[in-house]
């Protein structure tokens, strides 16, 4: 038995494995592109370490794809055979992984909360809880957990910066922008390469309409992101969003091609259809197209990838994005095939399947109807679930693309009541008035 760097027991006879565990967890906290290699080094140091197998399973789940779900299942099954003589905390991690694999992130979240009640320094449970609740639209839960855990931490404990970054983002998604910015900037002061803290402040600057500050924020910090994973693409997407609001469409296209959708970059080549990259690219192309910008053939590679993901519903928020790509390229047959795959998936038990059935399917149907020019139908499909969209996950800034689609359909269908409904909705969710936002000004 050894302890991790925060003093929590890890069931392994290998000091090398214990150090490798810390190195892998640090890679997860800091969004390192070599996280997979770190986990493999941990497994090589002690293949019988239950937490090593669980960490591999968590890594598979965090990619939100059917392909890596298979990897997670295998790791979970292996871990199950190794957990008999481990600690209750480690066994709870094994249970959380197992229920997450079965599509119930809500149960997994509850288990991580139980772990944190007894072990508030379990940074792995904390970050998994934070990100999962983000992807299921529960900022209130994110914030409550930050507040309950952070009092047990001190700035001398390894991983404290991750607590600050999560504090910043939980406050931002809860609309508490001043508190979010203070925490995020403090995290960056301590570690300028902290990607999650940089991301939280980028959200604050976007939501408060400080676009030129946002551009400077990203440009100042980006040289410290070498070795980081695809989250840096998302920061560059935020940079493009600032430029879009300022009307600099040529700069947006430049950032698309050389920053957040650079097809020849090693990160993109490694996983060409990673959910966050797909969301970045498709949502930006939709916005640009709506503003009359010629995006050339950029839709095609995304639609090609969409066709290979039929039935893959691990990340519900990605599904309407795939549908946008299929609709934009006129692939109605493939789009209907994807909808059928969603319907099949929605028959399964678990929280994820319910969200797909109750929210992702009607919104994806609306996206297709919009793409087919059936604007009144698109509004009718989407209107009943506008208030449920947060369950898909994604930030306020990310969900904006779906709100813009609804508004565009309402305007083109001449549905003035629905136009007003949407404008009132975004007015209550965003501190910048619609009249001062490029996607809404013409309808405000």
Segments (PLM) and residue ranges:
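Internal metal/ion-chelating core segments
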Residues: 145-246
